Amino acid sequence: MNLRLILRIARTELAVLFYSPVAWLLLVAFTCQVGFDFMNILTEIVKIKALGNTITFSVTAGFVLGLKGIYEVIQETIYLYIPLLTMNLMSREYSSGSIKLLYSSPVSSVQIIVGKFVSMVVFALIFVVILALPTIVMFISVPHVDITLILAGLLSMFLLILTYCSIGLFMTTLTSYQVVA
């Protein structure tokens, strides 16, 4: 496989993705959701301390895991964001007719799919960076932060987002209609 062609397809796909307002709106909505969830968890911890109770659990584990942990809450809603990104990946090529140009060019179908998936990997990294921002605040405010727990949570969220992206990419190859994909 020619890596330059794959990266060119990925760069073009990212440019098309960021020219549309959908990607920007999803990033803003995801950032707001992460911020609200972070503040809810922080409020619960402050309430426990204000009542005079001692925190018997690891603050890092309570922040990251648990029933109200930030990764748990984001994991429950991340599936709503990914289909809005992946529905255009291949169906746009089918509906505009540019798939015929791609097939006639010296690019294999595997390179097309891998290039589009690489663009989704970059977008998933942006999601993970946004999700990592509250951990920076945690490093400042929480003593004895368990870094392995945080990194494992971020890695699991990254892999979950990539799983949803691969499912979305597969679904968009089946039809030329964006809504169906």
For each feature predicted by the language model, list its residue ranges.
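Cytoplasmic juxtamembrane interface segments
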Residues: 1-18, 90, 158-181
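Hydrophobic alpha-helical transmembrane segments
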Residues: 1-81, 85-88
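Secretory targeting signals
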Residues: 34-39, 58-76, 115-180
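Perimembrane helix-loop junctions in membrane proteins
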Residues: 41-48, 92, 96, 143, ...
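Transmembrane helix boundary and interhelical loop/hinge segments in multi-pass membrane proteins
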Residues: 83-103, 117
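Alpha-helix N-cap/helix-start motif at helix boundaries, enriched for small hydrophobics
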Residues: 110-114
